[in-house]
A protein has these predicted regions:
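Walker A/P-loop
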Residues: 126-149
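Conserved segment of the helicase C-terminal RecA-like domain
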Residues: 429-463
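Conserved helix/coil segment N-terminal to the catalytic DExD/H
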Residues: 192-223, 234-239, 398
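Post-DEXD/H (motif II) to motif III coupling segment of the RecA-like Helicase ATP-binding lobe
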Residues: 230-293, 469
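Conserved helicase ATPase core of P-loop NTP-dependent helicases/translocases
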Residues: 170, 186-198, 350-351, 363-400
């Protein structure tokens, strides 16, 4: 019986040489159904079976980051494994050296935390990493420390940092300056309209700015960082990662995975097996983040508005409901401190913004959505940091990812969501700690539209959010509210 030979094909793929029967076993093991694929037009039209196959029997290739899973599967099936010399693990890295290097970067008020050193050490040991660390844990410092290290070890190669939005390009650049570095000397900001070529060693870019470029462009990079890398499941970002054929150091950071097995395995394949550095609950307990209080307000709608609806119809009703929107406005106006209202649909955001503006003259109301320019968003952020009772009406897409306002005292979920990524990122917006802000209140608006003893769609989504809160060890209370017509 022929054994199985594992070879590093390049920095993206592992090649598995084995008998056809073993290849079929591997193909079956690494084939997964995409969640909710049955609703996709390509599946409904029978153009695709809704499955993702991570191993190709034809080429024998699989993402290099999945090596631990390949090794475990083959061993459990009793196959003898031979490793090519390209897969010999690097020598152990002394953690004392890591700690000494990281501590040398401390300047001013910056104090490095132990879990940050652990995360940095994990990456330096293997050259790859998928760092799972929540909002407020200092992911940007972890990236910064690794950038500083790799600048010393990469001779003629540059470093690529990929972020989801132009706002986060500016934020990362600003964070590096806050850490006492000189990004204007070392970093090139790349987004719409920017020159794609530079002599600087570090390129900070949105994925939209570079995903169409060819492999030749990406050959200049020896290290890549992808911040908020849960977006790497998007085809464009996966395309970027697979063009970095000879990029040795590959690091992804994210606040959360979305809970699906295929999502996790794709990310781990592109980077490495994930390491959870810390949790929001631990950061709150250790006083690195504000105390979180979750108030789940379950609105009981009047009988005449309860009838069977399809999901889009239910969402449309909730976003347009005058009684519901009026309740949200009144709630926001009774809260002390800066308040963020998050909603999904622009029409609802516009309605809430107009109603709030009409009902108050002595509080600043800001409206932020996808069309709001990055410079305007940054201007709003600066104003709110100096305010005590501002109200921001914003879309989930914009504010759940990357606008960093520390002085947020209250968050209102005005639209029902069940995405673990969006929920946790949105909560993270309010957990930043400041001298005069140690508490954050989340008001999760849920809707009881049960009809004929059958739960409505968004009430089921609320149950999903409760599950997330429980898994994250958040304290929450459920308060029933009768909604007047």
């Amino acid at each position: 019986m022929m054994g199985v030979t594992l070879t590093k094909f390049n920095e993206v793929y592992l090649r598995i040489k084995c008998e056809p029967s073993v290849a079929r076993e591997l193909s079956e093991f690494f084939t997964f159904e995409v969640p909710n694929a049955k609703f996709m037009p390509s599946v409904r039209n029978r153009l695709w079976d809704g499955k993702i196959r991570l191993f190709s029997p034809g080429t024998g290739k699989i993402y290099l980051g999945l090596l631990p899973y390949v090794r475990k599967f083959l061993a459990e099936q009793g196959h003898k494994i031979q490793y090519d010399s390209s897969l010999i693990p690097p020598p152990k890295f002394d953690k004392k050296i890591t700690a000494k290097f990281v501590r040398s970067l401390e300047k001013g008020k910056l104090k490095v935390r132990d879990y940050q050193i652990d995360a940095i050490h994990t990456v330096l040991e293997s050259g790859r990493g998928l760092i799972l660390s929540p909002t407020g844990s200092g992911k940007s410092f972890i990236i910064y420390a690794l950038v500083r290290y790799y600048l010393k070890t990469l001779n003629d190669k540059k470093i690529l940092i990929i972020v989801p939005t132009t706002n986060l390009v500016e934020q990362m650049y600003g964070d590096f300056a806050d850490y006492g570095w000189f990004p204007d000397e070392h970093c090139h900001k790349l987004y719409a309209g920017s020159d794609k070529n530079t002599t600087k060693e570090v390129v900070i870019s949105t994925w939209q700015s570079i995903y169409k470029l060819d492999k030749k462009y990406f050959s200049q990079f020896g290290a890549v960082f992808v911040d908020e890398c849960h977006l790497a499941k998007a085809k464009s970002l996966t395309g970027i990662m697979t063009k970095l054929l000879d990029c040795q150091y590959r690091i992804g950071t994210t606040g959360t995975l979305d809970g699906s097995e295929i999502h996790q395995l794709v990310l781990e394949g592109l980077f490495a097996k994930h390491k959870e550095v810390t949790t929001t609950a631990k950061l709150v307990k250790e006083k690195y983040l504000s105390n979180l209080h979750i108030h789940c307000l379950v609105l009981s709608h009047v009988t005449k508005n309860r009838h069977q609806r399809k999901y889009p119809e239910e969402m449309d009703y909730l976003s347009k409901s005058p009684a519901r929107n009026n309740f949200i406005c009144k709630l926001a106006l009774t809260l002390d401190g800066n308040t963020l209202i998050l909603a999904q649909y622009i029409k609802q955001l516009e309605t809430l913004n107009l109603a709030l503006t009409d009902h108050t003259k002595d509080r600043k109301i800001f409206f932020v959505y996808g069309a709001t320019e990055a410079t305007e968003r940054d201007k709003i952020r600066g104003i709110v940091e100096e305010e005590n009772d501002a109200i921001i009406v914003a879309s989930y897409g914009v504010f759940s990812m990357g606008i960093n306002i520390k002085r947020l005292h209250n968050i209102i979920f005005a639209s029902p969501y069940k995405s673990q990524v969006k929920v946790l990122q949105s909560i993270g917006r309010g957990l930043r700690l400041t001298k005069d802000k140690t508490e954050c209140n989340l008001f999760d608006i849920a809707d009881d539209l049960c009809y004929n003893n059958k739960s409505n769609y968004t009430l089921k989504h609320f149950e999903e959010r409760i599950l997330i809160y429980s898994q994250q060890e958040f304290d929450y209370e459920i308060i029933p509210v009768k909604l007047k017509s």
